[in-house]
């Protein structure tokens, strides 16, 4: 056994980048296999599947209607990874995200090692301890390609005697790539981060060369988008694109959201990053950490312009948070006047925490299983994920036995946390939000009849139902809404008057808070509401009811 371990470690030392990339990709694939898409990823899965039945255009579609919030490039990649729509599941739809995520983490290691031997290893370890980062990678991480472009650009800029003309061409190509993936936001974020890196590096010739290239590329991309959208859909498509991609991104909000509010989201990765900022001193203005901070803060400051507030937009900055935190661990020191007794206590406590983390994560897999029994039917629990996570953590503990250095202990702890996220926490969330049991119950009760939703947003709730049924069945799902509800063109919305004309004794799905309103509307039509059962769509519970005629009293 020891010979095998030595052979594997020898190969890993010789081909570290490939080892990190393929190891992470394998773990991500195993962790996502068999899981259901949840939250916003359900919408992305639905859009990917919709490409099979509708022409592929500049935007993904829902029932053939363009959804202007995203270009279709990432969805085309996902559609190809589903074998052109033949296997539409979480692990196939999110395969491009997992590839870009594994690549970004491997490139984070390479950037750190290029700057200083050993720093890349610490940056790699810190990349494994952010649940939000992993959650994005194992979901439909539409911002991960932009993240991959960012680390690629910085890795290229680290090369000695780099030709400015060549690097400018690569930068321009990456801007086009980001525009194709993320629309105008993609190249703007990449350009801001790269500008921050160059400014803190003092490379002003490259800075102005990139700035000129960026302005030309962005203008060209917007001009091409204007021509393409007018050619495909006329003024209407361009106006919708402009509204969704520009106006909706500037809808107001706290300017401190990304600078302050998002830091807890990426904990515990953000802890060493904050330590670096506090203890780094004047060294923060110098290479290598200065340019990394320049990249990160340029992105965060740009995002802090009041607008849409989603932490996933910060994905591009995460590798540089890990790199800065790794530098702080190795070099930043707080000048605390502590006695030797207190220093010894702190060291002992830190060592104890690192020793306990692997065993805590093994216990955590068992705890996730036990807790899941209270929220999920036993037949829907991801037993295989919990078992595999437990075994992988045990294997990691075995492989690191006898290694007592701080680096080895931190490496073991970070590996165990990453495995715990992938094989315990994320599967537990997926199982807890799995909509299949409720959908199957509704389908069994309704047979071939239509299904109605009452006062529920189709884009957030109804799509969780639609994603679980086939294309033919989706055409039999309708959404009844009163005047207080916003309607969208993508779904089969009906007003109360229209919906009640269609409605017989079919199943109606609603939240309990709307039961009284539905009862009043039904009473006006001499019908009564009969509850059938309840269940979950996502993380909320919903009622399934029928409307049946009121019993007419017999004449005396």
Model feature map: region roles:
Residues 44-50, 177, 186-291, 295-312, ...:
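Transmembrane-lumen/periplasm boundary regions of multi-pass, lipid-linked membrane glycan transferases
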Residues 26-28, 43-66, 73-76:
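Extracytosolic helix-loop segments that constitute the early lumenal/periplasmic catalytic or substrate-binding loops
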Residues 94, 132-146, 183:
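Short acidic/glycine- and proline-prone juxtamembrane loop motifs at membrane-interface regions
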Residues 113-118, 151-170, 178, 281, ...:
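Membrane-interface transmembrane helices that cradle and orient dolichyl/undecaprenyl
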Residues 68, 72-76, 84-103, 136, ...:
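Loop-to-helix entry region of an early transmembrane alpha helix in multi-pass inner-membrane enzymes
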Residues 406-549:
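Short periplasmic/luminal acceptor-recognition loop of GT-C membrane glycosyltransferases, typified by
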Residues 13, 17-22, 108-129, 147:
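Transmembrane-helix signature of polytopic, membrane-embedded enzymes
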Residues 107, 126-127, 145-162, 173-175, ...:
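Specific aromatic-rich, kink-prone transmembrane helix
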């Amino acid at each position: 056994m020891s010979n095998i371990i030595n052979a594997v470690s020898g190969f890993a030392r010789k081909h570290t980048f490939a080892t990190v990339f393929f190891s992470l990709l394998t773990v991500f694939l195993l962790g996502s296999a068999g899981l259901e898409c949840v939250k916003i990823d359900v919408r992305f899965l639905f859009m990917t599947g919709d490409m099979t039945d509708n022409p592929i255009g500049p935007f993904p579609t829902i029932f053939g209607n363009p959804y202007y919030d995203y270009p279709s490039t990432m969805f085309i990649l996902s559609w190809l990874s589903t074998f052109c729509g033949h296997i539409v599941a979480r692990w196939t739809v999110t395969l491009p995200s997992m590839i870009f995520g594994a690549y970004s983490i491997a490139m984070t290691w390479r950037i750190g090692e290029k700057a200083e031997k050993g720093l890349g290893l610490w940056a790699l370890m810190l990349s494994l301890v952010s649940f939000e980062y992993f959650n994005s990678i194992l979901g439909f991480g539409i911002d991960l390609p932009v993240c991959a472009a960012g680390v690629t650009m910085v890795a290229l800029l680290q090369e000695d005697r780099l030709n400015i003309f060549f690097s400018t061409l690569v930068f321009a190509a990456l801007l086009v790539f980001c525009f194709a993936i993320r629309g105008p936001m993609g190249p703007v974020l990449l350009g801001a981060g790269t500008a921050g890196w160059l400014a803190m590096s003092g490379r002003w010739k490259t800075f102005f060369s990139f700035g000129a290239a960026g302005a030309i590329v962005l203008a060209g991309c917007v001009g091409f988008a204007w021509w393409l959208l007018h050619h495909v859909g006329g003024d209407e498509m361009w106006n919708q694109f402009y509204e969704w991609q520009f106006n909706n991104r500037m809808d107001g909000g706290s300017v401190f959201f990304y600078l302050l509010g998002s830091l807890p989201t990426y904990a515990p990765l953000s802890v060493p990053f904050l330590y670096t900022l506090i203890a780094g001193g004047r060294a923060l203005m110098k290479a290598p950490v200065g340019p990394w901070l320049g990249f990160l803060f340029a992105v965060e400051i740009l995002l802090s312009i009041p607008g849409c507030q989603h932490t996933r937009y910060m994905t591009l900055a995460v590798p540089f948070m890990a790199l800065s935190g790794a530098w702080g661990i190795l070099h930043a020191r707080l000048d605390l006047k502590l006695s030797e007794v207190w220093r010894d206590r702190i060291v002992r406590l830190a060592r104890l925490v690192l020793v306990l983390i692997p065993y805590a994560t093994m216990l955590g897999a068992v705890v996730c299983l036990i807790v899941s029994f209270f929220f999920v039917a036993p037949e829907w629990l991801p037993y295989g994920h919990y078992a595999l996570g437990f075994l992988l953590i045990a294997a990691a503990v075995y492989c690191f036995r006898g290694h007592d250095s701080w680096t080895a202990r931190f490496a073991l702890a970070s590996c165990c946390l990453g495995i715990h996220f992938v094989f315990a926490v994320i599967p537990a969330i997926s199982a807890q939000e799995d909509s299949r049991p409720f959908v199957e119950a509704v389908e069994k009760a309704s047979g071939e009849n239509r299904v109605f939703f009452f006062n529920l947003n189709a884009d957030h709730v109804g799509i969780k139902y639609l994603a679980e049924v086939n294309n033919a069945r989706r055409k039999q799902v309708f959404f009844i809404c009163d005047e207080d509800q916003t309607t969208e063109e993508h779904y089969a919305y009906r007003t109360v008057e229209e919906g009640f004309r269609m409605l017989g004794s079919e199943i109606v799905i609603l939240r309990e808070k709307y039961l009284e309103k539905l009862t009043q509307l039904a009473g006006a039509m001499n019908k009564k509401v009969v509850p059938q059962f309840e269940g979950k769509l996502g993380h909320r519970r919903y009622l399934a009811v029928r409307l049946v005629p009121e019993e007419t009293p017999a004449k005396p």
